[in-house]
Amino acid sequence: MRPEGSLTYRVPERLRQGFCGVGRAAQALVCASAKEGTAFRMEAVQEGAAGVESEQAALGEEAVLLLDDIMAEVEVVAEVEVVAEEEGLVERREEAQRAQQAVPGPGPMTPESALEELLAVQVELEPVNAQARKAFSRQREKMERRRKPQLDRRGAVIQSVPGFWANVIANHPQMSALITDEDEDMLSYMVSLEVEEEKHPVHLCKIMLFFRSNPYFQNKVITKEYLVNITEYRASHSTPIEWYPDYEVEAYRRRHHNSSLNFFNWFSDHNFAGSNKIAEILCKDLWRNPLQYYKRMKPPEEGTETSGDSQLLS
């Protein structure tokens, strides 16, 4: 019994015969080629298994190429902002020069009166300087907001490149001298790096290192904060590292066995002498353009077997 309101369509006899004919032909074709189809499937499975590594390498290379495009966008945004800022500064400077030319300069003055005049001018400059600092800070914050979409997109793409940050840090000309083989293994579990800067009430640089599960420590995120001034980065706060019991003794030994500046000492001891140098490299160089230090893997040549020791490209 059909539901109320349903429609019925009767297929003409000649079409039904045609369908049956096609069905019988298809069935015969399938039966006739069963063995051939099985062999084809086996060959396809073998080819698919052999090509997994090549496909993964291609995906990683595609992600790296996409990073190239994103970094170009970030640089364009930054360049546009800098040019606009420079043009604004030039315009304000020219206005100040014109205003200065319109005001007659002081006549001959005694040293005492000159110092008094100098003090008066300096007092007038203070609010102007404060206004300039605020304007520069607002401009910088505006630039950071405009860069954020590209930076977020860059971070998402980096997730598709296994070991990206370990590769970048280990190949930085200054950082490479501070990293041991054990440091590299620890860094291989690092999945992301983020840097945030705050200007108010103080200039603060926050470094966040994200890790997946590893045999060294339990932390998923380790945060290090630095107060920034004209001359240095000064340690402010760091997340305590929760070492696993099996590695805690080794961590203590490493920290006290080598008193020189290295990545492990910076990582495990926030107040280690010279650690501000590593913080500055991460904030001012690696974070802004990590791709320039990434060593790309040469894709395997056609017809050759892939191996874990593929040659690196500079």
From Swiss-Prot:
Name this protein carries in UniProt: Testis-specific Y-encoded protein 9
Subcellular locations according to the entry: Cytoplasm; Nucleus
A Pfam cross-reference name: NAP
Annotated GO biological process: cell differentiation; gonadal mesoderm development; nucleosome assembly; spermatogenesis
Organism from which the protein derives: Homo sapiens
InterPro entries membership: NAP-like_sf, NAP_family
Transmembrane stretches, start-end: none
GO molecular function: chromatin binding; histone binding
Keywords: Cytoplasm, Developmental protein, Differentiation, Gonadal differentiation, Nucleus, Spermatogenesis
Main location: cytoplasm
Its biological purpose: May be involved in sperm differentiation and proliferation.
Family: Belongs to the nucleosome assembly protein (NAP) family.
Record keyword Nucleus present: yes
GO cellular component, one term: chromatin
